[in-house]
């Protein structure tokens, strides 16, 4: 991997951060914002169809750029900005990471930076959120646009910024990065390892952050998405994009995993011990009255109040290997638990389970919806679990009424795109081209 990342941005202007004595800075601690420091809400899988979630999460389908490009989503978090600012968005933070950030900010030898892939349009709301928590980073960095209108991919932008930090702060000998996206964690590790080959004193640590997803209130989310579709449809004709409509009561049958299981898969992928998994689940869960005082349950996101659903008895699987497919799905190799003594799955001589075979489940990172197959299977990265690491995974079959987003009228695109267009850098209606011609 090359250490030089040319994205057409020139050099970063650190002078706007105020005076910093570069001779005193020995370490840099870089914090990601979304789902790392702050638990940004995701589209609720219990409300939307799979197609609707795909439309909302994509950056280049809706004219406003989708869920993570619309400042209204952050503004709608909890009970809204006016209420949440007074209570510092309580309950929406990863408090362990907040504590680490406070320590980084306190130390005079550390450059503490908040680095996000969001653009400058989010500066107002993001700075309001972190200020309410009393987090005074030396720098809050948003993705920049090149003079020619080019928007770099978030990963390349962050790597470019790392280089700029090392160029300006010459005495840094240690880097610590807090990040939640698996592909970024892997790329940062490879890039920093390559840097360490040329500079033996360039130590680094990457903290993989894994927290259960959080969601907006049902009525807030419905109103928000309706507004996003209205805004899109006003701009769509001039951008030659299709019009979309909100559709209610779509019957669907889906296979899902509970939120707690989604959290477990994520932590297992990042090699976080089981004890820490359960501690993290406990810290981010709502306790319900139970005969077992030690029983902790993660509350599932709320369902539409005016629609019904029913859940079939779940199926149990013995997880033998895990991996990922891009930043979209966790991949799970599993054996049906029927026929095995589940209490003995950790014993090597008893649980003779083929770890490289069995059923492959694709579990959506953001929603927990399970698919049985994906077209391009070459993008998987597998980690075989030792017997002591195996666990019993439950999947549920649910028939429900959900909401959907569909074409407002028949639409035939004049251009043909493949599923690889997202990673190939197709233009975003909001941000313009993501790669140079």
UniProtKB/Swiss-Prot annotation:
InterPro entries: SAK_HAD
The keyword Thylakoid appears for this protein: no
Pfam families recorded: HAD_SAK_1 (PF10307)
Listed GO CC annotations: box C/D methylation guide snoRNP complex; nucleus; small-subunit processome
Phosphoserine modified-residue sites: 290, 293, 418, 428
UniProt GO MF annotations: histone H2AQ104 methyltransferase activity; RNA binding; rRNA methyltransferase activity
Keyword list, A-Z: Phosphoprotein
Superkingdom of the source species: Eukaryota
GO annotation, biological process: box C/D sno(s)RNA 3'-end processing; rRNA methylation; snoRNA guided rRNA 2'-O-methylation
Name of the protein this chain belongs to: Uncharacterized protein C4.02c
Signal peptide: none
Residues with PTM Phosphothreonine: 296
PANTHER family: OB FOLD-CONTAINING PROTEIN, NUCLEIC ACID BINDING (PTHR10335:SF23), RRNA 2-O-METHYLTRANSFERASE FIBRILLARIN (PTHR10335)
